[in-house]
């Protein structure tokens, strides 16, 4: 459920916690998605990327940024055209399917 070159490593998935490490190469991003009844924390470890919640403006995120996405909020994130981004997510979830994938982020949405 990604567009472009994305490397995902699952670091922990036991109990109600999932920790994942992502490397998004330039121009890559995940799909619009949300986490049912679960908050997600995204930590930017390196590089530069984008983050957007449905109905909000796309914003630039950089190394050191921490983004907390409330439960059930549709969102996406990925790299900028000129930079990779490395990030880690921590999601506390109470159900098996921790993310509901919606649709690809269009080029028009990405380029806005």
Regions found by a protein language model. Give the residues of each.
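A short hydrophobic beta-strand segment most commonly corresponding to one strand
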Residues: 68, 82-101
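Short acidic-glycine-tyrosine-enriched beta hairpin
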Residues: 55-72
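A short, N-terminal "cap"/entry segment at the start of jelly-roll beta-barrel domains
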Residues: 1-18, 31, 98-112
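Short, surface-exposed secondary-structure edge patches
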Residues: 21, 41, 56-59
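Structural motif
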Residues: 48-50, 74, 84
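Asparagine-centered strand-capping/turn motif at beta-strand->loop junctions
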Residues: 78-80
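Short, conserved beta-strand element in jelly-roll/cupin
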Residues: 23-25, 34-51, 90-92
């Amino acid at each position: 459920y990604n567009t472009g070159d994305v490397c995902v490593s699952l670091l922990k998935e036991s109990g109600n916690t999932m920790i994942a490490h992502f490397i998004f190469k330039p121009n890559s991003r995940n799909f619009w998605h949300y986490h049912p009844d679960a908050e997600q924390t995204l930590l930017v470890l390196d590089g530069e990327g984008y983050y957007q919640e449905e109905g909000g403006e796309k914003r630039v995120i950089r190394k050191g940024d921490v983004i907390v996405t409330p439960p059930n909020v549709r969102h996406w994130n990925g790299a900028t055209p000129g930079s990779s981004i490395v990030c880690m997510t921590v999601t506390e979830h109470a159900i098996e399917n921790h993310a509901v994938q919606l649709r690809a982020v269009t080029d028009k949405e990405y380029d806005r």
